[in-house]
Amino acid sequence: MSPQTETKASVGFKAGVKDYKLTYYTPDYETKDTDILAAFRVTPQPGVPPEEAGAAVAAESSTGTWTTVWTDGLTSLDRYKGRCYGIEPVPGEESQFIAYVAYPLDLFEEGSVTNMFTSIVGKVFGFKALRALRLEDLRIPIAYVKTFQGPRHGIQVERDKLNKYGRPLLGCTIKPKLGLSAKNYGRAVYECLRGGLDFTKDDENVNSQPFMRWRDRFLFCTEALFKAQTETGEIKGHYLNATAGTCEEMMKRAVFARELGVPIIMHDYLTGGFTANTTLAHYCRDNGLLLHIHRAMHAVIDRQKNHGMHFRVLAKALRMSGGDHIHSGTVVGKLEGEREITLGFVDLLRDDFIEKDRSRGIYFTQDWVSLPGVLPVASGGIHVWHMPALTEIFGDDSVLQFGGGTLGHPWGNAPGAVANRVALEACVQARNEGRDLAREGNEIIREAAKWSPELAAACEVWKAIKFEFNPVDTLDX
């Protein structure tokens, strides 16, 4: 063997398998301001100590592998390794604990949500020593936040662009989501916008199917939008879904939307992927488009309490990747969402600085510095009777989106839009007068219905509709 390639055990390398905790469990470590911090809910296999399981998570999501390797000696593991620096029991769960892991910032490519997730959650979730693993929260350091452009301009700039202030924005998802021709689809858009809504929306799976190709939909919806805008004197928008099978096709649709002069487009950011989403967000910023984000597929990732990734992490990632709106659940509608948890990640979307608050599921203080905020979108199984609660829960900086709650009105789409607009204006006025929306909500709606026949008809149709199921994802006791 050539002297240049000969290796000897005497240089300090010792082959074999080492316990992860010997290298990656460091309870005395003091976290740095530049570290990315993660909170994992860990369910180890029977017989695996918490310290070993937590260290395994830190190792397998950073520099570690299952055995000692020669090339460990060619770099500084102390500089680059992830560290499990804390273990915390989960109340009422003997087999679970929270493991806190710190990652050096140099492990991650600047401005890449894709790379961040590939490292932190890319492989370790299939590790055999763990029965289940869930990423509960991330602390993104300021140094890393500043490598992202985030949402196009933020909430205030969107309000200025739309000239709408002092209330939540109103939207509607066109139904049925699949099967309409482009012309009939555009007709429904026009009726809803004419009736008083600010936005209408493509559903998440409306892309370019045989019954309605994307270009036809874009043209008819744009015609509807400008016609309603002319008649009402209000700026209107329709979320034209640019999601496609390739990034090139997605960008072609975005370019066409810009050429049509519409104010906003849409993307399914989880099924489309973070690389595609960030690419589209950069284009929207450069070309004056707002970007609405749908979270289709999120529940596959975030709904189970023991395994996956909490939506608050996906929400933070979206704010970094870029998007002006994102669906966030409703608390009161048909979709999963416990109140305090939902309010926690809504604040993470909108506010500049959010304190650690375990009562709302927030594990770390997060400083977004100058990264613009995102409007949360409440959508899914909501109707006029929910308006007081939605206004009280989400406040003005939100989009309240009624699909069936608009198009299901017995008199048609435009009266359905009128009913929602009247209900919203009544709730905002009552709140501004000092009334308690949580306690007096039904009374406020009944009073408004006396002078709005459209609202009265909507109240009658949906008076008995409730979705009374307990959420799966709840706060720990």
Swiss-Prot record:
The modification N6,N6,N6-trimethyllysine is found at K14. The active site is at K175 (proton acceptor), H294 (proton acceptor). The keyword Chloroplast applies. The modification N-acetylproline is found at P3. The modification N6-carboxylysine is found at K201. Pfam families: RuBisCO_large, RuBisCO_large_N. RuBisCO catalyzes two reactions: the carboxylation of D-ribulose 1,5-bisphosphate, the primary event in carbon dioxide fixation, as well as the oxidative fragmentation of the pentose substrate in the photorespiration process. Both reactions occur simultaneously and in competition at the same active site. This is Ribulose bisphosphate carboxylase large chain. It comes from Gerbera jamesonii. The gene is rbcL.
